[in-house]
Amino acid sequence: MANSAHFFHFAPNFAGRKLPEHECIVGYAAIIQKLGLPIPIPRRIALITPGSKKKFTDEFLLFPKAYAPDDNPALDEINALYNHLVFALKYEGVNLLFFSKLSSHYNLEQLAELVAIEPSGQYSRRIWFLIEWLTGKSLPGIKDVNKKSYVLAVDPKLQFTCSGMRSPRHMVINNLPGTIDFCPLVHRTDRLEHFIKENFSTKRENYLKGFRKELLLRASSFLLLKDSKASFSIEGESPKSKRAARWGQTIGQAGMRELTTNELCRLQQLVIENERFMKWGLRTSGGFVGEHDRFSGEPLPDHISAKPDDLERLMNGLIETSHLLTEDPIDAVVAATKIAFGFVYIHPFVDGNGRIHRYIIHHLLAVKHFSQQGFIFPVSASILDHMSAYQKVLAGNSKPLLDFIEWKETPDHNIEVLNDTIDFYRYMDLTPHAEFLFECVKDTWNRIIPEELTYLNAYDTFKQYIDSQFDMPDALIALLVQFLEKGNGQLSKRAKLKEFKELHEDEIRDIEAEFAKNFMNKSTTWFIKE
């Protein structure tokens, strides 16, 4: 397999990654490299290897030589391109950002020539459909297909899809899980399939049936506050208790109100509260996440937000896709990933995006009936405990795009984007984000919720003992527990001499023993049983 005049690409290093020796880049990455398309290389690069077996890693898709697309120098460019596209659709799935840029690289006549190679073939029809769906234009000279079976636009074995609608012109079922203005995709991976098979939603229902309703309500109240504080902490804020409690109440209502742009603006007002230094609503200027140079004030972006002129279209697409996913049987965590992480990348507001992004996770899980109505799912608390992974996942999309966004500094040290970037925010690969969110879901059900329920059970048992022996006021019992927690089960000398001076030494020993029995000798870690 030699270098040709077309798309095969050999290099020891490619897009900042070291490649295994003697391997040839094919598919999407090879086309992007050859044509110079202004988009990042896909997360996983397809390679033809001297080996005899397929092997998939987080970075590479390795295929034996028998899988190589025909890229013979005798072929013209369009025919070689078609062969690589067939390979890509068959093994890499649909890449909407790629097809959007490919459709603007070639003129309509060249694209029609591409489709005409096998006008009734399933891959040709899928390519044709994607081009016309993305451009909104009909390719010249291509007649409607007839007397053929319908084929799926997206292979559901490779990526998560929706039920779909028929496109009679192409004889293609459009099962893309989104709209033209917002359609992130998620690949099916072994990790995601494993998570889905664990069926957390059903196991949750069975587990919670074993607890008193009163205990669940109290746990939900504590978890609301915990999640609210965690969401602020993720943003580096330490809100007063009242503010955290108000946002916690809002989280508790997730799924009860329809998701609209106006609803998101209402949530922003609840998050920010004070309009003195900023305007509520969609941004009217550029935006970025990052720092400023301490001397010049120049922006140092880690993420560049969508252009203000694109926000209305992007948000309409996001809302419409949210409604589509709500009604479709697509997995709830995958749906939450697409809408919530899509929102935070768009970054439609000047401030409050992060907390609203995490609210959207709650909303989608609630409307998809993954989380139980009235019982909070404290996903922010788990995210806070996994901040390094969270930041890595977010940077996975943002960082590669920085090389393809042209911008200039504004007089107020903001960013003004100069090129067309809307596709970067509507056609994303959110596979790592779905895996991360599933990890947080698992952690929440395996650790955070059980710890809270175990703690409240222990507290109630300890309180019953104190009530039966000392008839102590509830507020004083709460204070006693606080002191014992701080003292690792021992009451401090100060507490003995001041707040609990009425207790005798033998009574204190009994209390400490009862505390240890309930709080210190029980594991607070619980795992969902099969």
Positions of the model-derived regions?
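FIC/Doc superfamily catalytic core
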Residues: 1-350, 355-530
